[in-house]
A protein has these predicted regions:
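Conserved hydrophobic helix-helix packing surfaces used for dimerization/oligomerization
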Residues: 133-134, 278, 366
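A polyampholytic, Gly/Pro-enriched intrinsically disordered region
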Residues: 180-191, 224-228, 247-256, 406-409
Length: 409
């Protein structure tokens, strides 16, 4: 669908003023200027940045300035650059565990409307004027995800029905009736597809959680629809990047965010195509500009060009969290959910356990519960990680609440 359209790139051309001069190099130079302006603004108005002004504005050679989720949890108000009276919405993000402090993210009305500005071209890949979109994400209030999507879609004469998260499948099915596009989190959309296979949305947008390809394939098969994916988080102001009809990476919100990929240990930028930690600077935000924010997510810029003909770097599918990812000596990375994608797509794999040893060659040892062919398993893993030595054994796997790849020395 619309594989040649470049809605987000065109929006960036207009927002940045670069027009026909838009290239990856010119965009990065423009972004770096905006980040510098945001650093000066933040150092003047926010206590956190003011207390670290020298490190922010004049770092020592080889030093890098970053902020983390823990910085925000500790004193979120210290990141404010405006009066609390100008804050239109505060989002509280709980921390796993009973004692962890939550993150609180502050937005002005201007910040939130900028998100709607990005949603407008982003949703154009999967919708047409005159259609109906049902949103299975939070809320009716104007500055919720649903409310901002409503604002964005109304600009293109598209109707929006905001249902909220799926709690009752019958009610959700009723809300989805007649919709051309459904927006929701992957697991809930998969459940809805199984419960209501006769729904026939033309498109589905998945967001809010990691998107397994098995879910994409299931929705495409049951509903015979085209599935799009979105990347973003509360810290980015919800919007971050969205797939176009070519489905090869996220077209980024480059007019408001500068995305970088760094080595998680050294903090140095890594070459395009290399996996590392996703870092962003929300340079356009006025209320709480997060600058050089380490997300803890593993990603990379796509090494190839997009089928739509776009000229800007795209973010590849985010692989998960750093703490659940192992970086290989050859520059690749592997995580438990990546293995899930490969192994659970194979017939005869009921469960598995994995161990990885790097000494220095990487050896992946698998215990497979089921009757899958070991040679087939090795072949499929080598398609994704050609540098791994694979050892496959059959056996009973210990059930654990949280699975991970065991690192062996």
């Amino acid at each position: 669908m619309k594989k040649q359209e470049q809605y987000v790139d065109n929006w960036i051309r207009e927002r940045t003023g670069l027009g026909s001069a838009l290239t990856a190099e010119n965009l990065r130079a423009w972004q770096q200027e905006r980040v510098r302006e945001a650093e000066i603004y933040a150092a003047e108005h926010a206590a956190f940045y003011r207390d670290r002004k020298e490190a922010l504005l004049s770092p020592e050679p080889g030093q890098h300035f970053f902020i983390t989720a823990e910085d925000i949890r500790r004193r979120p108000e210290d990141f404010l650059c405006v009066s609390p009276k100008k804050i239109a919405r505060i989002i509280t993000i709980p921390t796993s565990g009973s004692t962890g402090r939550p993150k609180r993210i502050f937005f002005t009305e201007e910040d939130l409307m900028a998100t709607a500005d990005f949603f407008t071209p982003g949703m154009a890949y999967m919708t047409e004027p005159g259609q109906l979109v049902t949103v299975f994400m939070e809320g009716e209030q104007v500055y919720s995800i649903g409310g901002l999507l409503r604002i964005a879609l109304e600009r293109r004469e598209i109707s929006t029905r905001v249902h909220g998260f799926v709690h009752d499948l019958k009610e959700a099915e009723q809300a989805a009736q007649g919709a051309d596009c459904l927006v929701g989190v992957p697991g809930q959309m998969a459940l809805l597809a199984e419960a209501a296979p006769k729904l026939r949305p033309k498109t589905v947008l998945l967001s809010g959680d990691y998107v397994p390809q098995s879910v994409v394939r299931r929705l495409e098969s049951i509903w015979e629809c085209e599935v799009f994916q979105h990347w973003g988080m509360t810290e980015t102001g919800y919007g971050g990047g969205v797939e176009c009809g070519a489905h090869c990476g996220y077209h980024l919100r480059d007019a408001d965010l500068m995305i970088e990929i760094i080595h998680p240990e050294t903090g140095e930028s890594v070459p395009n195509g290399t996996w590392g930690e996703v870092v962003f600077s929300a340079f356009a935000r006025k209320g709480m500009p997060l600058l050089h924010y380490r997300t803890g997510d593993i990603g990379r810029f796509c090494p190839d060009t997009c089928g739509c003909g776009g000229v800007l770097p795209r973010l590849d599918k985010v692989m998960g969290r750093i703490e659940n990812t192992i970086f290989l000596h050859n520059g690749d990375a592997i995580s438990i959910h990546q293995l899930d994608e490969v192994l659970f797509a194979l017939d005869g794999v009921h469960d598995y356990a994995a161990k990885l040893k790097q000494n220095p060659e990487a050896t992946l040892s698998l215990t497979i519960e089921g009757d899958a062919d070991p040679d087939m398993i090795t072949e499929f893993i080598h398609k994704k990680w050609s540098g791994l030595e694979i050892r496959v054994n059959s056996g009973i796997v210990e059930r654990k609440r949280k699975r991970s790849i065991v690192r062996e020395k």
